[in-house]
Design a protein with these regions (language model features):
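Conserved C-terminal region and hinge/linker of Rieske [2Fe-2S] proteins, especially
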Residues: 12, 32, 39-43, 160-162, ...
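Early exported N-terminus immediately downstream of N-terminal targeting peptides
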Residues: 63-78
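Short beta-strand or tight-loop elements
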Residues: 47-49, 69, 97, 158
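Short, positively charged
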Residues: 5, 40-44, 121
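N-terminal secretory signal peptides and thylakoid transit peptides that target proteins
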Residues: 2-21
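Rieske [2Fe-2S] iron-sulfur-binding domain
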Residues: 82-173
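C-terminal segment of N-terminal export signals and the immediately downstream linker at the start
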Residues: 16, 26-67
Length: 173
């Protein structure tokens, strides 16, 4: 290798190294500015949403966002509650009583994350073989209590932490 080739290689190396160090430096300066725009982790962990349920008729449901995920709120009819409670636990892939999925004394209200437990798709309401929810992505069927009845989903739809603030308001989170 001639002396001139060594200079060219050394020059190329210094050029590349300088740009690399510069890019890392710019990234180190810009990252804190971008990161400070994210919500505070403590606030995000404690986030709550209050929902007015006074206008929801029996048999109807609404969807709200909480922590970036859909939450299904359904005001079930007496027939839907009876149907959910008549299911034998042996018939369920993930056995759970309907009574354990609702608040005592507020059996008509079902509150659950609107995310299929298989791969995270959003199920369609009032669809499927069990008059509950149907996941169009891979065919999971949930009943009127959000319990998996058929399909690849391994578990029932999740019930988030929630409470009734009063007769017209639910606080999720």
């Amino acid at each position: 290798m001639s002396k001139e080739e060594k200079k060219v290689n050394r020059r190329d190396f210094l050029f590349t190294a300088s740009y690399t160090v510069g890019a890392v430096g710019v990234g180190a300066v810009i990252w804190p500015m971008i990161d400070q725009m994210n919500p505070d982790k403590a606030q995000q962990a404690l986030a709550t949403t209050e929902v007015d349920i006074s206008n929801i008729e029996p048999g109807k449901s609404i969807t709200v966002l909480w922590r970036g995920k859909p939450v299904f709120l359904k005001r079930r009819t007496d027939e839907e509650i009876a149907e959910a409670r008549a299911v034998k636990l042996d018939d369920l892939p993930d056995p759970q009583k309907d009574e354990d999925r609702v608040k005592t004394g507020k059996d008509e209200w079902l509150v659950m994350l609107g995310v299929c437990t298989h791969l995270g798709c959003v199920p369609l309401k009032d669809k499927g073989d069990f008059n509950g929810w149907f996941c169009p992505c891979h065919g999971s069927h949930y009943d009127v209590s959000g319990r998996i009845r058929k399909g690849p989903a391994p578990t029932n739809m999740e019930i988030p932490k929630f409470e009734f603030v009063d007769n017209n308001t639910i606080k999720i989170g």
